[in-house]
Curated annotation (Swiss-Prot):
Negative results: does not show activity on alpha-3/beta-4 (CHRNA3/CHRNB4), alpha-4/beta-2 (CHRNA4/CHRNB2) and alpha-4/beta-4 (CHRNA4/CHRNB4) acetylcholine receptors. This is Alpha-conotoxin Vc1.2. The keyword Iron does not apply. It is found in: Secreted. InterPro entries: Conotoxin_a-typ, Conotoxin_a-typ_CS. Alpha-conotoxins act on postsynaptic membranes, they bind to the nicotinic acetylcholine receptors (nAChR) and thus inhibit them. Shows inhibition on alpha-3-beta-2/CHRNA3-CHRNB2 (IC(50)=75 nM), alpha-7/CHRNA7 (IC(50)=637 nM) and alpha-9-alpha-10/CHRNA9-CHRNA10 nAChRs (IC(50)=1000 nM). In addition, it also shows inhibition on high-voltage activated (HVA) calcium channels currents (30% at 100 nM) that are mediated by GABA(B) receptors (GABBR1 and GABBR2). Belongs to the conotoxin A superfamily. One of its GO terms (molecular function) is acetylcholine receptor inhibitor activity.
Length: 64
């Protein structure tokens, strides 16, 4: 292979790697956001329950 062909193959490999990296990164961001939403809903559920709120003041923002 000539120099020009090797450079072209190199650029194609870099481009393919970059596309795969950004695509998988976005997918993991979505999973992180979904997990964060679930945690938030769980904490809000505890904070709306008086018994849970008293037992977990650090979660609900109230310090003893």
């Amino acid at each position: 292979m000539g120099m020009r062909m090797m450079f072209t193959v190199f650029l194609l490999v870099v481009l393919a790697t970059t596309v795969v990296f950004f695509t998988s990164d976005r997918a993991s961001d979505g999973r992180k956001a979904a997990a964060s939403d679930l945690i938030t809903l769980t904490i809000k559920g505890c904070c709306s329950n008086p018994a849970c709120m008293v037992n977990n003041p650090q979660i609900c923002g109230r310090r003893r």
